[in-house]
Curated annotation (Swiss-Prot):
It holds the Pfam family HAUS6_N. The lineage of its organism: Eukaryota, Metazoa, Ecdysozoa, Arthropoda, Hexapoda. Residues 329-356 form a coiled coil. Residues 354-376 are annotated as: Disordered. It is found in: Cytoplasm, Cytoskeleton, Spindle; Cytoplasm, Cytoskeleton, Spindle pole; Cytoplasm, Cytoskeleton, Microtubule organizing center, Centrosome; Chromosome, Centromere. Residues 365-376 have a biased composition (Polar residues). This is Augmin complex subunit dgt6.
Length: 654
C-alpha cells in the first residue's frame, strides 16, 4: 500500500474539521470565546476523541442558544468525574429535546457521540448543531431589529417614489464623487511636484521626505527654530519692559520725594560739604553734583552713598549688639560683685581671728601695770594651734633694763668686744659667764672715726650663748634661769682670770677697725627667702627633686644654715638670732635710744612706731594673702623648717 496517498475519507474528515473550525471562529467574532475554549480551539481538535474540548464547546453553544435553559439543566463548572458524567447525560437529554421541539431530524443522537466525541460522525453532527445555533441567533437578531425599527406597512406606490428619489440622489452622489476624485488627483500631482522640488532643494530623497519619522524630526526642528527666533526674543522684551516699568516707578517715587523735600542749592552744598568732612571724602567740585539745570547727578550721589554706607552699616550693627553686650557685661559685673562681697566677708572674719588676743597675752597685760612696760603688738599675727605648728619661733629673750644692782648682773648676748680669736672655742663651750666687777671694767678704745661710747648696759650684762638659745627652741622658756652668782671670796683670783679672758687690759691693735653693718641688696630673682635685709637669717630655697624632697633634708639644711650664721659673732651687723638691730649704733641719733630696738619679721620696733597689721602689706611677702580661702590642712610638713627665718618672738619681757 502506498503511504503517500491519503485515503478519501480522511481527506473529507479533514475538510469537515476545518469547516467546523471556521464556523466557531465566525461565532467568536460576534460572541467572544471563553479563555479556556480559546486555548483549545484548533482545526484538528476533533479528529480524535477529545472529551475536554467537547465539554467546553457544548457549554459555549448551549449558552449562546438559551442561557436560562442552560442554567436550569446543567451544573457548571465541572469539578470531578461525577459532574462530568452528569453533564454528558444532560447533554443527550437536551439535544433530544431540541430535536423534538424544532423538528431537526437528528437521527444520530446517541450516547456514544458524547462518550467518544471525535471522528467523522461527531464532526458532522457538531456542524449541524452549530448551523442550528447560528440560525437561532439570526432569528433573535432580526426580531430585535424589527422591534427597534418599527417600520409601518407602506404601499407599493410610495415605495416606487422613494426608490426613484434614492436613484436620483445616488446619481448626483456619483457625479459629485467623480468631480472630487478628479480634484484630488490634480492636488496629488501638485503635491508630488512640490515634493520633487523640495527634494531637489534640500538634497533629500522623496521617500525620506514622505517618511513619518522625517516629518516628526522636521516638526521638532521647526518648533525649536520658532522658539529661538520668536519666543525667546519676546520673553526678553517682556523682561526688559518689566524692568523699565520698575525703573519708571522708582523715578516717579523719586520725583515725588524730590518735590516734597525740595531744598535750595546752598543747603545741599552745605550738607554735602559736612558729609565730605565727616567721612574724609575726596574734594568734590560744584559741577560734580549739579548740572547747569540745577539737578543732582546720580553718579555723584551714588558715590557719596557708597562712601558712607560702610560706616552706617557698622554703626547699625553695633546698635543691634549694644543690648546684648550690655546684658553680658551686667551679668559679669554682678558675678564679680558677689565674689567681692564673699571675699570681704571672709577677709573680715580672718582679721578678727588674727587680731583677737590670746588668754596668755590678756593675763600678761593685766599683770603689767607699770608705765615703763610697753606691750608691743607682734608684726606677725598670732594664729591658731593648727597654724602655729607650721612655723618655728626663736626662744624668748628676757632683757632686764633695771640695771641689776649688786651681784645679780643682767643677762645679755655676747658681743664682738667680749671675744678674741684664741678664746672663741672656750667661749663656745661655756654656756654662761659672769660679768667682771665694776672696778675691773675698762672700756676698750674703739675706732675714733665712729665716735661711739657704749652705755652702762654693755658692761653690766651677762652673756648668753646663742648655741644654748637655739637648743631651747622647743622648750618652755617662759622663766629665765637665774644666773649663777659669783662667790665673793674668790673674786681675787677669778677676777683677773676673767679680765684676761675678756681682754680688757689688752691694747688696741693698730689698724684694726670695727666691722660696720652691711646691707644686702634685694634682688627680685634672689633664691633666698625675702625676709630680712641681712643674709644671716636668709635660708636658701632647696629645689624640689626626687632626691631632696624629704622633710629630713629640708630640716638639716635649715638647721645647718642657722647654726653657721649664729656662730658668726664677729659680725656686728646683726644679732646671732638675726632679729635684733646692730648693737653698735651707726649715727649719733641712734645713741639717744635708751632701749635696744628689736626687729620682728624685718621690722624695727621702738616707742615711736606703732605696729599696724596692714602696714606695707602690699610689699610684705610674709603677710598672708587673705583674698583667697585658706586651707591650712594642705600645708605640707616638709616646709616647717624652710620657714625658720619667718619665726616670731612670741614673748618680750622687759
Amino acid at each position: 500500500m502506498d503511504r503517500t496517498i491519503i485515503a478519501p475519507w480522511k481527506a473529507e474528515e479533514k475538510e469537515q474539521s476545518e469547516k467546523l473550525h471556521r464556523k466557531l471562529q465566525g461565532l467568536a467574532l460576534v460572541h467572544p470565546l471563553p479563555d479556556e475554549l480559546r486555548k483549545l480551539i484548533a482545526w484538528d481538535m476533533f479528529l480524535k476523541p477529545n472529551q475536554v474540548a467537547f465539554v467546553h464547546v457544548m457549554h459555549y453553544l448551549f449558552r449562546l442558544l438559551d442561557p436560562a435553559e442552560f442554567k436550569r439543566r446543567f451544573f457548571w463548572p465541572i469539578t470531578d468525574k461525577k459532574s462530568e458524567a452528569n453533564f454528558r447525560s444532560s447533554t443527550v437529554e437536551y439535544l433530544k429535546h431540541l430535536n423534538e421541539k424544532h423538528q431537526l431530524h437528528w437521527a444520530n443522537i446517541k450516547s456514544y457521540l458524547v462518550v467518544m466525541p471525535g471522528g467523522m460522525r461527531f464532526i458532522n453532527f457538531l456542524l449541524e448543531f452549530v448551523g442550528f445555533v447560528i440560525q437561532e441567533l439570526i432569528k433573535q437578531r432580526e426580531k430585535s431589529l424589527g422591534l427597534e425599527a418599527g417600520t409601518p406597512n407602506v404601499s407599493a406606490k410610495v415605495m416606487a417614489r422613494q426608490n426613484a428619489v434614492m436613484k436620483e440622489y445616488a446619481s448626483s452622489y456619483v457625479v459629485n464623487l467623480e468631480e472630487n476624485t478628479a480634484l484630488l488627483r490634480d492636488k496629488t500631482q501638485k503635491i508630488r511636484r512640490l515634493m520633487a522640488d523640495l527634494s531637489a532643494d534640500m538634497g533629500v530623497p522623496e521617500e525620506q521626505l514622505a517618511d513619518d519619522g522625517f516629518l516628526d524630526e522636521f516638526e521638532a526642528t521647526a518648533a525649536l527654530g520658532v522658539e529661538r527666533v520668536i519666543t525667546q526674543p519676546t520673553e526678553r522684551k517682556f523682561d526688559l519692559e518689566a524692568s523699565l516699568c520698575g525703573l519708571k516707578e522708582a523715578i516717579d517715587l523719586f520725583q515725588v520725594k524730590q518735590a516734597e523735600n525740595n531744598q535750595s542749592k546752598e543747603a545741599v552744598e552745605k550738607a554735602l560739604r559736612g558729609m565730605r568732612v565727616l567721612f574724609d571724602c575726596d574734594a568734590v567740585t560744584e559741577g560734580d553734583f549739579y548740572d547747569p539745570l540745577g539737578a543732582s547727578k546720580m553718579d555723584a550721589l551714588l558715590n557719596g552713598f557708597n562712601r558712607i554706607s560702610g560706616t552706617i552699616a557698622e554703626q547699625l550693627d553695633a546698635n543691634d549688639h549694644y543690648n546684648e553686650s550690655n546684658a553680658f557685661v551686667t551679668t559679669d559685673l554682678q558675678a564679680l560683685r558677689v565674689e567681692l562681697s564673699q571675699s570681704e566677708v571672709q577677709l573680715n572674719n580672718l582679721l578678727k581671728k588674727l587680731n583677737e588676743p590670746s588668754k596668755k597675752d590678756k593675763g600678761s597685760a593685766n599683770a603689767s601695770g607699770s608705765a615703763r612696760v610697753q606691750t608691743l603688738q607682734p608684726a606677725t599675727p598670732r594664729f591658731e594651734s593648727v597654724i602655729s605648728s607650721k612655723f618655728v619661733s626663736t626662744p624668748p629673750i628676757r632683757i632686764d633694763m633695771g640695771g641689776g644692782g649688786g651681784r645679780n648682773a643682767p643677762v645679755r648676748l655676747a658681743l664682738q668686744d667680749d671675744f678674741n680669736g684664741k678664746q672663741f672655742d672656750a667661749l663656745s663651750n661655756s654656756l654662761l659667764a659672769p660679768a667682771p666687777p665694776r672696778s675691773a671694767r675698762k672700756l676698750k678704745a674703739l675706732d675714733q672715726s665712729t665716735g661711739i661710747d657704749l652705755n652702762g648696759t654693755l658692761n653690766r650684762s651677762k652673756i648668753n650663748d646663742p648655741m644654748q638659745m637655739l637648743r631651747t627652741i622647743h622648750k618652755n622658756t617662759s622663766k629665765v634661769k637665774a644666773a649663777p652668782q659669783a662667790n665673793l671670796s674668790s673674786l681675787g683670783s677669778k677676777w683677773k682670770q676673767m679680765q684676761a679672758s675678756f681682754g680688757f687690759d689688752e691694747a688696741p691693735v693698730p689698724g684694726a677697725a670695727v666691722i660696720s653693718p652691711q646691707t644686702s641688696p634685694t634682688d627680685p630673682s634672689d633664691p633666698f627667702t625675702p625676709l630680712s635685709g641681712s643674709e644671716c637669717t636668709r635660708i636658701e630655697r632647696i629645689p624640689r627633686t626626687s632626691e631632696n624632697n624629704t622633710s629630713l633634708i629640708a630640716k638639716s639644711a635649715a638647721v645647718i644654715k642657722v647654726l653657721e650664721v649664729s656662730r658668726n659673732v664677729l659680725n656686728l651687723s646683726t644679732s646671732p638670732s638675726g632679729r635684733l638691730d646692730a648693737l653698735v649704733p651707726h649715727t649719733e641719733s641712734h645713741q639717744q635710744d635708751v632701749a635696744p630696738r628689736l626687729q620682728l619679721n624685718d621690722r624695727t620696733i621702738n616707742d615711736s612706731l606703732q605696729l599696724d597689721p596692714d602696714f606695707n602689706i602690699e610689699n610684705d611677702k610674709n603677710a598672708f594673702n587673705v583674698s583667697h580661702k585658706f586651707d591650712f590642712d594642705q600645708i605640707g610638713g616638709e616646709d616647717d623648717l624652710q620657714n625658720i627665718s619667718d619665726s616670731v618672738l612670741k614673748d618680750i619681757i622687759f
